[in-house]
Amino acid sequence: MLSLYHTSRGFARFSRAVDFFRRLRYNFFVMKNIILIGMPASGKSTAGVLLAKTVGYGFIDSDLLIQNQQKRLLCEIIEREGAEKFIEIEENVNGALWAERCVVATGGSVVYGERAMRHLKELGTVVYLELSLAEVERRLKNIARRGVVMRRQGETLAELYAERAPLYEKYADATVKCDGLGLEETVRAIAAAVGL
Protein backbone atom coordinates (compact mmCIF):
# COMPACT_ATOMS: atom_id res chain seq x y z
CA MET A 1 0.00 0.00 0.00
CA LEU A 2 1.32 3.46 -0.91
CA SER A 3 1.96 5.90 1.88
CA LEU A 4 1.02 9.56 1.73
CA TYR A 5 4.75 10.31 1.30
CA HIS A 6 5.02 8.14 -1.81
CA THR A 7 1.79 9.53 -3.21
CA SER A 8 2.90 13.14 -2.74
CA ARG A 9 6.33 12.38 -4.26
CA GLY A 10 4.63 10.78 -7.23
CA PHE A 11 2.31 13.76 -7.59
CA ALA A 12 5.27 16.17 -7.43
CA ARG A 13 7.02 14.22 -10.21
CA PHE A 14 3.84 14.15 -12.25
CA SER A 15 3.38 17.88 -11.70
CA ARG A 16 6.95 18.62 -12.86
CA ALA A 17 6.41 16.43 -15.92
CA VAL A 18 3.18 18.26 -16.77
CA ASP A 19 4.99 21.62 -16.42
CA PHE A 20 7.81 20.38 -18.63
CA PHE A 21 5.43 19.23 -21.37
CA ARG A 22 3.39 22.43 -21.09
CA ARG A 23 6.58 24.48 -21.67
CA LEU A 24 7.62 22.13 -24.46
CA ARG A 25 4.24 22.48 -26.15
CA TYR A 26 4.39 26.26 -25.77
CA ASN A 27 7.85 26.40 -27.33
CA PHE A 28 7.00 24.06 -30.18
CA PHE A 29 3.52 25.21 -31.08
CA VAL A 30 3.40 28.87 -30.11
CA MET A 31 6.94 30.24 -30.15
CA LYS A 32 8.76 27.93 -32.54
CA ASN A 33 11.00 30.38 -34.31
CA ILE A 34 13.94 29.54 -36.54
CA ILE A 35 17.02 31.62 -35.77
CA LEU A 36 19.68 31.65 -38.51
CA ILE A 37 23.33 32.32 -37.63
CA GLY A 38 26.49 32.16 -39.71
CA MET A 39 29.18 34.11 -41.49
CA PRO A 40 28.32 37.10 -43.67
CA ALA A 41 27.20 35.90 -47.12
CA SER A 42 26.15 32.50 -45.78
CA GLY A 43 22.61 33.13 -47.03
CA LYS A 44 20.82 33.89 -43.77
CA SER A 45 18.65 36.66 -45.22
CA THR A 46 18.20 35.20 -48.70
CA ALA A 47 17.36 31.68 -47.53
CA GLY A 48 15.47 33.06 -44.54
CA VAL A 49 12.95 34.97 -46.67
CA LEU A 50 12.27 31.95 -48.87
CA LEU A 51 12.05 29.62 -45.87
CA ALA A 52 9.53 31.94 -44.19
CA LYS A 53 7.37 31.97 -47.34
CA THR A 54 7.67 28.20 -47.69
CA VAL A 55 6.57 27.35 -44.13
CA GLY A 56 4.16 30.26 -43.62
CA TYR A 57 6.25 32.09 -41.00
CA GLY A 58 7.02 35.76 -40.63
CA PHE A 59 10.52 37.02 -41.43
CA ILE A 60 12.76 39.29 -39.35
CA ASP A 61 16.20 40.55 -40.38
CA SER A 62 17.94 41.77 -37.23
CA ASP A 63 20.42 43.85 -39.26
CA LEU A 64 17.47 45.83 -40.63
CA LEU A 65 16.11 46.27 -37.11
CA ILE A 66 19.47 47.76 -36.09
CA GLN A 67 19.51 50.08 -39.11
CA ASN A 68 15.95 51.23 -38.43
CA GLN A 69 16.66 51.84 -34.75
CA GLN A 70 19.93 53.70 -35.42
CA LYS A 71 18.73 55.46 -38.61
CA ARG A 72 22.05 54.56 -40.28
CA LEU A 73 23.53 51.79 -42.40
CA LEU A 74 25.48 49.10 -40.57
CA CYS A 75 28.75 50.19 -42.19
CA GLU A 76 28.14 53.78 -40.99
CA ILE A 77 27.50 52.64 -37.42
CA ILE A 78 30.69 50.55 -37.42
CA GLU A 79 32.72 53.35 -39.00
CA ARG A 80 31.52 56.06 -36.59
CA GLU A 81 30.99 54.10 -33.38
CA GLY A 82 33.54 51.30 -33.71
CA ALA A 83 33.14 47.53 -33.63
CA GLU A 84 32.64 47.16 -29.87
CA LYS A 85 29.87 49.78 -29.73
CA PHE A 86 28.18 48.13 -32.71
CA ILE A 87 28.32 44.75 -30.94
CA GLU A 88 26.69 46.36 -27.89
CA ILE A 89 23.91 47.84 -30.05
CA GLU A 90 23.44 44.50 -31.82
CA GLU A 91 23.24 42.63 -28.52
CA ASN A 92 20.61 45.04 -27.18
CA VAL A 93 18.46 44.72 -30.31
CA ASN A 94 18.68 40.91 -30.42
CA GLY A 95 18.30 40.62 -26.65
CA ALA A 96 14.98 42.50 -26.81
CA LEU A 97 13.62 40.67 -29.85
CA TRP A 98 10.22 39.03 -29.49
CA ALA A 99 8.80 36.82 -32.22
CA GLU A 100 6.31 34.02 -32.77
CA ARG A 101 6.51 31.64 -35.73
CA CYS A 102 9.20 33.68 -37.48
CA VAL A 103 12.43 33.04 -39.29
CA VAL A 104 15.04 35.40 -37.83
CA ALA A 105 18.14 36.20 -39.88
CA THR A 106 20.82 37.57 -37.56
CA GLY A 107 23.99 39.50 -38.30
CA GLY A 108 27.21 37.51 -38.47
CA SER A 109 28.53 39.11 -35.28
CA VAL A 110 25.47 38.22 -33.16
CA VAL A 111 27.48 35.40 -31.52
CA TYR A 112 29.67 37.96 -29.72
CA GLY A 113 26.67 38.83 -27.54
CA GLU A 114 26.26 36.04 -25.01
CA ARG A 115 23.11 37.52 -23.44
CA ALA A 116 21.47 37.95 -26.84
CA MET A 117 22.35 34.39 -27.85
CA ARG A 118 20.84 32.97 -24.66
CA HIS A 119 17.67 34.93 -25.42
CA LEU A 120 17.57 33.79 -29.07
CA LYS A 121 18.00 30.15 -28.01
CA GLU A 122 14.97 30.57 -25.74
CA LEU A 123 12.98 32.02 -28.66
CA GLY A 124 13.55 29.11 -31.01
CA THR A 125 15.86 26.71 -32.77
CA VAL A 126 19.24 28.18 -33.70
CA VAL A 127 20.49 26.93 -37.07
CA TYR A 128 24.08 27.53 -38.16
CA LEU A 129 24.44 27.97 -41.92
CA GLU A 130 27.97 26.66 -42.27
CA LEU A 131 30.12 27.66 -45.23
CA SER A 132 33.77 26.92 -45.89
CA LEU A 133 36.17 29.85 -45.77
CA ALA A 134 36.77 29.49 -49.52
CA GLU A 135 33.04 29.82 -50.22
CA VAL A 136 32.69 32.82 -47.88
CA GLU A 137 35.59 34.51 -49.69
CA ARG A 138 33.99 33.75 -53.06
CA ARG A 139 30.60 35.17 -52.03
CA LEU A 140 31.76 38.15 -50.00
CA LYS A 141 32.77 40.82 -52.47
CA ASN A 142 32.90 44.09 -50.53
CA ILE A 143 33.47 43.49 -46.84
CA ALA A 144 33.43 47.21 -45.91
CA ARG A 145 30.08 48.01 -47.59
CA ARG A 146 28.44 44.93 -46.04
CA GLY A 147 28.98 46.22 -42.52
CA VAL A 148 31.08 43.27 -41.38
CA VAL A 149 32.36 43.69 -37.82
CA MET A 150 36.14 43.33 -37.64
CA ARG A 151 37.20 43.63 -34.01
CA ARG A 152 40.90 44.16 -34.66
CA GLN A 153 42.62 46.57 -37.03
CA GLY A 154 43.88 44.70 -40.10
CA GLU A 155 42.00 41.50 -39.24
CA THR A 156 41.71 39.17 -42.23
CA LEU A 157 38.63 37.25 -43.28
CA ALA A 158 40.46 34.00 -42.45
CA GLU A 159 41.10 35.26 -38.89
CA LEU A 160 37.50 36.37 -38.54
CA TYR A 161 36.30 32.97 -39.74
CA ALA A 162 38.60 31.15 -37.29
CA GLU A 163 37.31 33.33 -34.44
CA ARG A 164 33.61 32.99 -35.21
CA ALA A 165 33.23 29.38 -36.39
CA PRO A 166 33.60 27.92 -32.86
CA LEU A 167 31.02 30.42 -31.55
CA TYR A 168 28.52 29.44 -34.24
CA GLU A 169 29.07 25.78 -33.34
CA LYS A 170 28.69 26.54 -29.63
CA TYR A 171 25.28 28.17 -29.99
CA ALA A 172 23.81 26.06 -32.81
CA ASP A 173 21.01 23.60 -32.14
CA ALA A 174 21.41 22.35 -35.73
CA THR A 175 23.96 22.89 -38.50
CA VAL A 176 23.33 23.00 -42.24
CA LYS A 177 26.41 22.61 -44.42
CA CYS A 178 25.71 25.01 -47.29
CA ASP A 179 28.71 24.47 -49.59
CA GLY A 180 27.45 23.28 -52.96
CA LEU A 181 23.78 23.88 -52.12
CA GLY A 182 21.54 26.12 -54.18
CA LEU A 183 18.99 28.39 -52.52
CA GLU A 184 16.08 25.94 -52.62
CA GLU A 185 18.29 23.08 -51.42
CA THR A 186 19.45 25.24 -48.52
CA VAL A 187 15.85 26.04 -47.59
CA ARG A 188 14.89 22.35 -47.69
CA ALA A 189 17.93 21.48 -45.56
CA ILE A 190 17.02 24.09 -42.93
CA ALA A 191 13.40 22.91 -42.83
CA ALA A 192 14.57 19.32 -42.40
CA ALA A 193 17.04 20.33 -39.66
CA VAL A 194 14.24 21.86 -37.57
CA GLY A 195 11.72 19.12 -38.31
CA LEU A 196 9.38 21.03 -40.63
Protein language model regions, located:
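Hydrophobic anchor at the beta1->P-loop junction of P-loop NTPases
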Residues: 36
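Post-Walker A helix-loop "phosphate-sensing" segment adjacent to the P-loop in P-loop NTPases
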Residues: 53-62
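ATP-dependent small-molecule kinase phosphotransfer cores
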Residues: 61-110, 114-121, 146, 167
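A glycine- and Lys/Arg-enriched "phosphate-lid" helix/loop adjacent to the NTP-binding pocket
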Residues: 122-166
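P-loop (Walker A) phosphate-binding loop of NTP-binding proteins
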Residues: 39
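NTP-dependent small-molecule kinase module
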Residues: 26-29, 50, 54, 163-196
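Walker A/P-loop
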Residues: 45
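Short, positively charged and aromatic/hydrophobic N-terminal segments
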Residues: 3-5, 26-27
